[in-house]
């Protein structure tokens, strides 16, 4: 029996909240976190349940596992760390909560996702621009906690993506 507080609307029809963010990585994250705080909480509840059911670990154990990935993320993508810190502050959650959401695949599975990627090379797309896309082949029940995120990064291409609330990317 699933406790009342753990029951998720698995058949809920998703709608996607559009969140547009700009500024430094931390500023983008803070705006994103405050705009999606309810969905982030639901996403944490969702993965807490998923970790228990699929990996037989509780949320604090998942956080400890996720922390093992932090040095690599800091080394290769420090802006993601800053964005996650901003999300945590904006959503009034711990950094560990947001990091754990972003390491959910690594915590749940030791295999690659089944997502597909596509690229339209320079000169072949509209206005000659490069376009990159990826499918989202994940648990359908996670859609209810997803948002459409429009990211404006200084000196970098803008990004429009569907992502689970609290996730960074780009």
Residue ranges and their predicted role:
Residues 1-170:
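N-terminal mature-domain region immediately after signal-peptide cleavage
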